[in-house]
Design a protein with these regions (language model features):
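Short, structured segments at the rim of ligand-binding sites
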Residues: 1-221
Length: 221
């Protein structure tokens, strides 16, 4: 907007002041990459023990996720506009607590919980942003995950290869992503229903995962 001639002060602060102008002029602007989609793809690479590079992202925007993945034992390389996660045979459980940016994103909490189901040891996930943000827990448990949910806290007892295929139902956008990620490592064929939730935040996620080698397809019912 400023590039178009708007009079705006306070960008990056808690108070923004806007002074009206007669008209705005055309301008070219690059949209900020979706850090949540980028983070989901990084977790997909990690949970499957893969080697994945996400390009055209802003590593600074995912610093909290990168730090937690490194704490868990993953090797993460960052470039100017890319992040690479390297495979590891085992990783350890780490605790996360969601917080406003630059803290750990609530919109990656469910996906990270799926990752922690495969970790060595116990993880504690604390949700500070939204109520009722653990609706995916019941479906992960249906797949075999060992998770104890409480009001704002969920305790995840991880163990590799502990998930088995089952029909599961997406309850919201990020929950659907976590179930897809869990399905990638569950033994057998996992069916995730109500994936219209997924489409609200991801563009052809199944095609991107298939391009990385996942055995996944969208089925019309």
């Amino acid at each position: 907007l400023i590039a178009m001639g708007a009079q705006i002060e306070g960008a990056g602060t808690s108070v923004i002041t806007v002074e009206g102008v007669e008209e705005l002029s055309p301008a070219t602007h690059s949209i900020v990459p979706d850090r949540i989609e980028a983070g989901t793809l990084l977790i997909a690479g990690a949970i499957t023990g893969g080697h994945v590079t996400v390009e055209h992202c802003v590593p600074e925007h995912l610093q909290s996720l990168v730090e937690k993945m490194r704490d868990a034992g993953f090797r993460i390389d960052t470039g100017d506009d890319s992040i690479t996660v390297h495979a590891t045979e085992t990783w350890r459980g780490v605790d996360i607590a969601t917080a406003p940016y630059p803290g750990f994103p609530t919109d990656l909490q469910a996906q990270f919980m799926a990752l922690m189901t495969q970790a060595r040891g116990t993880s504690v996930v604390t949700e500070h942003i939204f109520e009722n943000r653990f609706m995916h827990v019941q479906e992960l448990v249906r797949l075999g995950a060992d998770i104890t949910p409480m009001t704002q806290v969920a305790v995840v007892r991880g163990r590799r290869n502990n998930l088995d295929a089952a029909p599961v139902m997406a309850t919201d956008l990020r929950a659907s992503a976590s179930l897809v990620l869990a399905g990638l490592v569950a033994g057998g064929e996992t069916e995730v229903s109500r994936i219209y939730h997924l489409d609200r935040g991801y563009e052809h996620l199944e095609e991107k995962l298939a391009g990385l080698g996942a055995d996944i397809e969208r089925v019309a019912v």
